[in-house]
Amino acid sequence: MAQAVTSMAGLRGASQAVLEGSLQINGSNRLNISRVSVGSQRTGLVIRAQQNVSVPESSRRSVIGLVAAGLAGGSFVKAVFAEAIPIKVGGPPLPSGGLPGTDNSDQARDFSLALKDRFYIQPLSPTEAAARAKDSAKEIINVKSFIDKKAWPYVQNDLRLRASYLRYDLNTVISAKPKEEKQSLKDLTAKLFQTIDNLDYAARSKSSPDAEKYYSETVSSLNNVLAKLG
């Protein structure tokens, strides 16, 4: 009987110990769970705080950048205006020397002149026409430098400009010559302008050998014509 009572008391003690241990285990688990949940809540709060703080930081950076750009632009504008140099505006420039036979290079824009005096080669006396023809011949001879450089557009421009004056002036001179001298001078003039046309074609074709050939013929024809002019 005594042994049975003792065994029952031992079982009760063991069961209480087991219950207390289970309670302790459950309590520790609950504490750990609560700690974990609290930690996760704190972590979430920290992340939200960081997100809220990053927005004003970026806005502050953008504002600082705009202010710096404004200051730099203002200093640049000040420097530009500081370097501005005033330009004095006066009256029109004096008439400059123009082509032979014109009073000045602005003659075509002189609205006080008649159209025939502004846009056409002005007629000269035979003596003045002969002098201008010699000047035009010199300019034609000077195209040799452009031929050597193969500057073909310049060769064509000078040839056509000077040849137009030369043809006009030679016709003036021929018309004043005696009848027995007119035909020979006309023949020399026709040969001269044929060689000038050949030289112009060589320049248009960009052929150096042909340009050299017809340039020599042009110079020879010019000398023959100028010798007749006196």
Curated annotation (Swiss-Prot):
The modification Phosphothreonine is found at T195, T218. It is a peripheral membrane protein. One of its GO terms (cellular component) is thylakoid. One of its GO terms (molecular function) is calcium ion binding. Disulfide bonds: none annotated. The modification Phosphotyrosine is found at Y215. Keywords: Chloroplast, Membrane, Phosphoprotein, Photosynthesis, Photosystem II, Plastid, Thylakoid, Transit peptide. It is found in: Plastid, Chloroplast thylakoid membrane. Pfam families: PsbQ. Required for photosystem II assembly/stability and photoautotrophic growth under low light conditions. Belongs to the PsbQ family. This is Oxygen-evolving enhancer protein 3-2, chloroplastic. It comes from Arabidopsis thaliana (Mouse-ear cress).
